Amino acid sequence: MANIRQQSKQHMKVVAGMFAALVWIGLSGRPGWRAVPVAAATGKSLGTKLANVDEPITRFDAVVITKLTVGGQQIDAGRSTGAREISPGTPFQADEDWLKNVSIFVTNRTNKVIVCAEVELLFPDIGDGSVGRPTTGYTISVGQRPEWSLYYRDGTKMLPDATRKPLSLAPGKTLEIPVADYINQIQSVVEEKLPFLQITRVNISRGSFYFEGGMRWEGSSHYYSVPETGHPGYYTKLASNYFPGDPGQYRARE
């Protein structure tokens, strides 16, 4: 009997949490907002979370973050620059494991193969980049950087990471990056400043993307650059309107 009562109480807590989440979103009063399904495990408390992806987006950008999911459910992400929010997305209800359940979808808009992709996670709960509140972030790197990019500007070579698997992201294809694969490293960085369970927001930015042949695109500057002949580690910027392919073939934002 005691077990039945305990199970009943747990069931009521889960139902109440789901109802509260839907009511909260329903009362938000913002046109276009939609209720995101609750992502919570039994016995874990729900909380309001937010996720943003970087702006601006130009028609010459090599890649675009096309989708974010939490627990397999797509969320309405806001827009941000670094750790600063530009326009809010739809808040959603999830448990303390929410960041582990995030997946980032990145699409290659160019006509070249991407061999290394980097995205940066910033945590506004820790700092927004203002005076006295520096940002804290973690860079997720997928694939292997080209040989040319493994040199510092003084000519010394970085130690390659043999644990990284090769990446070959073809034109028009989308890469799914599960944050769960990097959650232990992310947690270690975050907990130097704040208990991990207190993270409620994440801003996701495009970093460096490397192509076959050594060309690079930087999400922070939106510039392409190519290796300088005879100077390992050095790159030459291309024109601001350079794009490898047809910029209208793949949309800049879905």
Regions from the language model: what does each represent?
Residues 16-26:
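Bacterial N-terminal signal peptides
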Residues 210-219:
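Short acidic/polar inter-strand loop motif in beta-rich domains
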Residues 112-116, 130-131, 217:
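Short acidic/proline- and small/hydrophobic-mixed sequence motifs that coincide with surface turns
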Residues 1-10:
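N-terminal secretory signal peptides that target proteins for export/translocation
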Residues 127-196:
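Intrinsically disordered, low-complexity Pro/Gly/Ser/Thr-rich segments with frequent PxxP/GP/PP motifs
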Residues 105-111, 125:
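Asparagine-centered strand-capping/turn motif at beta-strand->loop junctions
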Residues 33-101, 230, 236-252:
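Low-complexity, acidic Ser/Thr/Pro/Gly-rich terminal tails and inter-domain linkers that flank the onset
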Residues 187-211:
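Short, surface-exposed ligand- or partner-binding patches at beta-edge/loop junctions that are enriched
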